[in-house]
Curated annotation (Swiss-Prot):
Signal peptide: none annotated. Gene3D superfamilies: Ribosomal protein L28/L24. The gene is rpmB. Keywords: Ribonucleoprotein, Ribosomal protein. This is Large ribosomal subunit protein bL28. Coiled coil: none annotated. It comes from Prosthecochloris aestuarii (strain DSM 271 / SK 413).
Length: 72
């Protein structure tokens, strides 16, 4: 499965790890993704989604209305 948040669209980024000796190594920075079961009240069903930690905060504040739009 791809490592992309369904709500925010966050995906892996690429950059450098820099050591104390200033050696650069390429690194892949992964988003903080979690697989969650979310209850959609409008549709009366559970949906399994991959969301980032930021998306979990958004859903706790605003509810799952934005998520319901994606699954209609």
């Amino acid at each position: 499965m791809s490592k992309v948040c369904v709500l925010t669209g966050k995906r892996p980024k690429y950059g450098n790890t820099v050591s104390h000796a200033n050696n650069h190594r390429r690194k892949r920075f992964e988003p903080n993704l979690h697989t969650k079961r979310v209850w959609l009240e409008e549709e009366k069903r559970w949906v399994k989604v991959k969301v980032s930690a930021k998306a979990l905060k958004i859903m706790s504040r605003q509810g799952t209305a934005e998520l319901a739009k994606l699954f209609k």
